[in-house]
Amino acid sequence: MIHDHPLFTLGTVAAFVWRVADAAMAQPRDLLSFATCSESGRKWRVAHLSDIHVVGERYGFRVESGRSGPQGNERLALAMAKLDAIHANNPLDLVLITGDITDAGRSAEWAEFFGVLVQYPRIASLVLCLPGNHDLNVVDRANPARLDLPMSPKKRLRQVRTISALSAVQGASVRIFDRETQRLGQTLEKSLESHKAEIAAFADKGSIGLSISLAQLWTVMFPMVKPPNTDDGLGIIILNSNAETHFSFTNALGMVSSEQAKAIDAIADQYPHAYWIVALHHHLVEYPKAVKKLSERIGTALINGSWLMRHLGRLDDHAVVMHGHRHIDWMGECGGLVIISAPSPVMGGTDDCDTYFYVHTLTQAAGGKLGLLPPERVDLPGRRSALAD
């Protein structure tokens, strides 16, 4: 009988232990108060954008929203102009974009993103990005039912395209975790030097052979880390939370590998007094917030999010988590770990609708903890508001 098999028994016990751990862990709740900053406390200003969904056409629509959503990339250009003005008045330390930079990972979309970014060099020097499911897992913009075969080079092409784009943005400032030494290694730029010819050949030919040889490259690139400038400074740990999917209907699934979680431990040991932003695309657990439809609750949180929450517990008073994915504006905490979910400054309605994003200020609060001060909301007026003015 199958239920008498030792593997079946072991699986049942493991599932029971997992459920007990999930039930016993702290539950997410809204952030009831913000930290206060002493005069001697250090502060870091972080602009948090997410899900900007850049399209490759001037009047292009998005996969998710179609004709009921925004067109083109004017809203992103407006956000960058606002950031440039904010930075000139009160300097920022970081502009963090937590995934879904593009709408479908196409080369034209990446080109449009860089076309906007290059107009604001001061902001470009502050930007750190990470991949979202739309950058990697959208098989076909026009046909959600289309499959990517596991051996298809198209998925690898989207991965390589993303890595190349991230290197252009932050190649000199982030370092790659070395699994052999269990310490931070070379910069992203240096790590890719020996693969440049191979990447260029794959981009030209798209062969399965080159796709296989580049398979490990994507895996070993995460986490990327911008280390703190001082022993007790602020560092940024960039995770890849995207599951390896081959079907558009499952493209939103997320998971953080155990290798990345172990790397976080080693990085924290290397910088024991540092503060951290842990940045990823997907939200860790379901939050205590109402949704309009059931589909928003299905398959969008991390598959192993509760496990990762428990794992990050060791960083709770020295870290905050920042993410995007569902375009939800939420600030809360779970077991002492502050979590910030970013709204999308682009999505959420047509170009007539107003959108917004936040500039957060992190501080060295009482007791040496990392605190979150009240955020600065930056409004982006829609065309309707602009006409009214």
Spans of model-derived segments:
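N-terminal active-site segment of His-dependent metallophosphoesterases
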Residues: I2-E112
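Beta-strand-turn-beta hairpins that frame and shape the catalytic cleft
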Residues: T36-A47, V220-I238, A274-Y275, E333-I339, ...
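Active-site neighborhood of phospho(di)ester-bond hydrolases with catalytic His/Asp-centered motifs
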Residues: H48-S50, D93-D100, L126-N133, L239, ...
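Active-site environment of divalent metal-dependent phosphoester hydrolases
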Residues: H53-R58, D103-G105, N133-R141, E244-F247, ...
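Extended active-site neighborhood of metal-dependent phosphoesterases/phosphodiesterases
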Residues: E112-K262, H311
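Active-site-proximal segments of metal-dependent phosphoesterases and phosphodiesterases across multiple
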Residues: A243-K262, D269-A319
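Conserved beta-sheet core of the metallophosphoesterase superfamily
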Residues: P288, K293-G367
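A short C-terminal boundary segment appended to hydrolase-like catalytic domains
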Residues: L362-D389
